[in-house]
Amino acid sequence: MVSPYIKNKGSAVRFCNWPPMILNLIRRIVHILLPTRRPLYRFLKSISPDYKNLDILEIGSGDTSINQSAEHIFSNAKLFVQTDVNDSLGHKYLDITSAIQIEEKFDLVLCTNVLEHIFDINSAIQNLRYLLKDRGHLVVSVPFIYPLHDEPKDYWRFTEHALKKLFSDFKILTIKRTGIRQFPTQYIFLFQKH
């Protein structure tokens, strides 16, 4: 028998009758047990001095009221452009799977916790490359062992090996993982366009 609290919608199972307070509590517990943002921000803080007075583009800046953007980490950048596909958040609109409307090229592009929400991954990677200056850097982070979120647009979980193949046109500068090797919760890659 199926629980009255879980509704099967297509292949995704979602909670449907739980009060928002309970769902928020569950989200907080998940973020404590499976952190992705804290390790990512530690990594970004460690590299931020290298990007002083340079141009930075952030893909998927998200809701700044809950500190999803990394702008505060790169306060020493010459230019920090925030983008999102949700134009109601007040950022510049950018869909990295479509024709790019941005003329500038960037020294660093941040694409953190975004790729798992993009179905047309090859177009996204091609456009990330387009947005970088020659020898520019790209930070990509993706969750691995992590609950579904932002449904129904949570499509992928990438292994380290898949990311290496997908970004084979880039030079890998750094690979970080959170969790243990066989059960990583997140991957963080620093690539260089070459």
What is each stretch, according to the model?
Residues 18-50:
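Class I SAM-dependent methyltransferase Rossmann-like catalytic core
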Residues 54-149, 160-161:
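Conserved SAM-binding loop
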Residues 154-170:
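Short alpha-helix
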Residues 171-181:
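Conserved S-adenosyl-L-methionine
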Residues 181-194:
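Core SAM-dependent methyltransferase catalytic element
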